[in-house]
């Protein structure tokens, strides 16, 4: 909203955290939603999003190379699991999609749409914000995700969530 709306919400003690989320790449078929075929996500048709999409594609490729260098066994398994995925549905070389969450906390869930055996790469940018940590109850652990960090995690395997994000200064954020 505008400055007046923000001031009103602040005086009322309401949440002032701006949140955005978008999925890049492809979507799996969802026959129950009258979409029996895979498709590219709608953001790809938005001219203003093209620079963002290219930047995310580049970040994806760079992260894949880090996985290849540090954990070649994970990289090779991921490549094998994606052998049957057509190139047109891939985002990078070993994923079908990428999600960008700006100040988004997530309730507990399991990524049931992921291919069993795969890993997710979570790249985090943050500034003047607390929270936004990955909580995995099965491991009794919460992963603090520092600025410029990368976490590799099999999100299909366990229930997990993201803790609330609280800016500690004006324009504070957490993006992953």
Predicted regions and their residues:
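Conserved metal-binding segment of the jelly-roll/cupin
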Residues: 123, 143-158
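Short coil/turn segments at secondary-structure boundaries
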Residues: 134-138, 147-149, 156, 163-167
């Amino acid at each position: 909203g505008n400055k007046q709306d923000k001031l009103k919400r602040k005086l009322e003690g309401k949440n002032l955290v701006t949140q955005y989320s978008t999925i890049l790449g492809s979507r799996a078929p969802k026959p129950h939603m009258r979409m029996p075929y895979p498709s590219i996500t709608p953001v790809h048709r938005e001219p203003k999003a093209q620079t963002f999409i290219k930047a995310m594609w580049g970040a994806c490729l760079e992260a894949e190379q880090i996985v290849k260098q540090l954990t070649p066994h994970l990289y090779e398994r991921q490549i094998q699991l994606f052998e049957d995925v057509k190139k047109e549905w891939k985002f990078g070389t070993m994923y079908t999609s990428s999600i960008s969450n700006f100040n988004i906390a997530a309730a507990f869930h399991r990524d049931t749409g992921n291919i069993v055996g795969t890993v997710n790469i979570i790249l985090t940018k943050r500034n003047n914000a607390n929270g936004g940590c990955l909580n995995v109850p099965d491991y009794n652990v919460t992963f603090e995700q520092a600025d410029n960090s990368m976490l590799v995690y099999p999100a299909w395997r366990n229930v997990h969530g993201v803790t609330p994000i609280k800016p500690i200064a004006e324009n504070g954020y957490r993006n992953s």
